[in-house]
A protein has these predicted regions:
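N-terminal leader/linker segments that initiate helical-solenoid repeat arrays
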Residues: 12, 20-67, 71, 85
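TPR/TPR-like (Sel1-like) alpha-helical repeat modules
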Residues: 103-115, 223-244, 270-276
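Structural signature of tandem alpha-helical TPR/SEL1-like repeats
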Residues: 64-68, 99-108, 148-159, 187-196, ...
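Short coil/turn and helix-start
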Residues: 62-63, 78, 96-100, 122-126, ...
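Hydrophobic face of amphipathic alpha-helices that form TPR/SEL1-like repeat modules
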Residues: 53-60, 87-94, 133-145, 173-182, ...
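Flexible helix-coil transition and linker loops at the boundaries of alpha-helical arrays
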Residues: 41-43, 77, 111-130, 162-167, ...
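Helix-start (N-cap) detector for alpha-helical repeat units in TPR-like alpha-solenoids
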Residues: 50, 82-84, 120, 130-131, ...
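Terminal, low-structured helical/coil segments at or just beyond the last alpha-helical repeat
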Residues: 31, 244-280
Length: 280
């Protein structure tokens, strides 16, 4: 596996240039998000410990008592528990048992990011912390209508960059790549986009595999590698569903397959077999 990683790294530099290392540099810790916000108010119900409150909240949630879950989770969130902050943020973002409220979701995610940004990437709660940064990036990208959270693409880049580099979050890497590809909040740079897509694609991120494959097939700002592009698109196509959500992946694959000649297809198949074998 180590040999494969070294080969992959060499191919990456050969494809995107030695400047690829820049994309791996850790982003600085973001400045505090919620300096003026009031602390979460603990509900009237008291619990023996934060852990008891969290367990009660998750038990109520799984039993379908979402209101009871919110009360218990608010207690744990008031003590800064990362999972409670994340769960409340997700519930308000999705309207899951509570009235949909993006501002409340933003504030819970902000507290989580502020209080746990230095969490070890190897910790059990790292995934929820990085997920909060990704959610914040999405909120900053478009803003929240009729609230103090305005559109701030540069701040979105900061959120995605931190989660992408410090936590190696594939969703953050994908979103950051999209911003580089579009030139939103950052200077447009297809090579940087390809590097971040590549990092996420290697983790099995389907949309990143599709867009990386498309970039390599078309040579859009990066050296054209049709066979490798078709390989990534094939992986994305195999992982996609036949529903409308993934239709764009199917379309990109069909276009790439039609544009490829027989030698491209054979080499793509060989690369695909190598890729799969290396991960067994």
């Amino acid at each position: 596996m180590r040999t494969f990683k070294l080969i992959a790294a060499a191919l990456w530099v050969a494809t995107f240039g030695a400047g690829a290392a820049y994309a791996l540099d850790a982003a600085p810790r973001p400045q505090p998000l919620t300096p003026a916000l009031a602390p979460v108010l603990a509900p009237a119900t008291k619990y023996g410990s934060v852990r008891d409150a969290l367990r009660s909240g998750m038990r109520d949630y799984n039993a379908g008592d979402k209101i009871g879950a919110v009360h218990a989770l608010e207690y744990a969130a008031g003590e800064g528990h990362s999972l409670a902050l994340w769960k409340l943020g997700r519930m308000y973002a999705d309207g899951d048992g509570v009235q949909h409220d993006d501002l409340k979701a933003f504030e819970y995610f902000s507290r989580l990011a502020d209080q746990h940004a230095d969490e070890s990437p190897d910790s059990p709660t790292a995934a929820v912390v990085s997920s909060a940064f990704v959610a914040l990036g999405s909120y900053f990208l478009d803003g929240i209508k009729d609230t103090y959270v305005g559109a701030n693409p540069e701040r979105a880049v900061e959120m995605f960059s931190y989660a992408a580099s410090y936590f190696s979050d594939s969703n953050a890497q994908y979103n950051l790549a999209r911003l580089y590809l579009e030139g939103t909040g950052v200077r447009k740079d297809a090579r940087h986009a390809a590097r971040w897509f590549n990092l996420a694609a290697e983790k099995g991120h389907t949309a990143s595999q599709a867009l990386l494959g498309h970039l390599l097939m078309t040579g859009q700002g990066v050296p054209r590698q049709r066979s490798k592009g078709l390989m990534w698109l094939t992986l994305a196509r195999e992982a996609s569903t036949d529903g409308p959500k993934d239709q764009w992946i199917v379309t990109l694959y069909d276009q790439a397959f039609a544009a490829a000649d027989e030698s491209d297809r054979k080499l793509a198949l060989a690369l695909l077999e190598q890729y799969i074998q290396a991960r067994r």
